[in-house]
Amino acid sequence: MEKFEQFKGIVAPLDRANVDTDAIIPKQFLKSIKRSGFGQNLFDEWRYLDYGEPGKDISLRQLNPDFILNQPRYQGARILVARDNFGCGSSREHAPWALQDYGFAVIIAPSFADIFYNNCFKIGLLPIVSEASIVDRLIRDTLETDGYRLEVNLDAQTVTTPSGEIHRFEVDSFRKHCLLNGLDEIGLTLQHADKIRTFEMNRRDRQPWLFLQQNGDKLRT
């Protein structure tokens, strides 16, 4: 997992509440267990006018010109501002995978579904809970201003607008540490590799019967 760095990015507004995970990445695209390749089907039923299927050539599909992510001014957006209860519905990990694969690094909303919120941190995607009134202003300003950008500083836990207005946000200290240091669950485990190795060696001495083959010979290490 990459370290989360301070950055300034283009904002895309998604002025909808209760966006569920099936809207984020429809069920027909869940067959893959890889984390990559989902970005092209993010919000598939809203981005395209035809029905999407795995393996379908994206270049041949008809874009919905009214959908926010298809508008030129929001190309390259790294921050998504949404409404209440973002990520509700089924607990598919593919939803944050699709958002990240598209290019988003931060999602700002008044509230998130719990499982979606937790899944975001596991892959290095930062979900920021912000007051509804602040989200209102961000969506309004983004719609009114081409190239609207926000600066996100996780270390200081701040979001800064082009006018210099600073909004603070809360984040669990452990999750913050993991994002800043690029540590997912595997990375955290590998920090204790020496202790794990020592434990396994000692366990062979204490419980040798666990390491015997059916014929009584010791398993190779």
Swiss-Prot record:
It holds the Pfam family Aconitase_C. GO terms for biological process: L-leucine biosynthetic process. One of its GO terms (molecular function) is 3-isopropylmalate dehydratase activity. SUPFAM superfamilies: LeuD/IlvD-like (SSF52016). It comes from the Bacteria. GO terms for cellular component: 3-isopropylmalate dehydratase complex. Keywords: Amino-acid biosynthesis, Branched-chain amino acid biosynthesis, Leucine biosynthesis, Lyase. It is an enzyme of class 4 (lyase). Pathway: Amino-acid biosynthesis; L-leucine biosynthesis; L-leucine from 3-methyl-2-oxobutanoate: step 2/4. Heterodimer of LeuC and LeuD. Catalyzes the isomerization between 2-isopropylmalate and 3-isopropylmalate, via the formation of 2-isopropylmaleate. This is 3-isopropylmalate dehydratase small subunit. It comes from Nitrosomonas europaea (strain ATCC 19718 / CIP 103999 / KCTC 2705 / NBRC 14298).
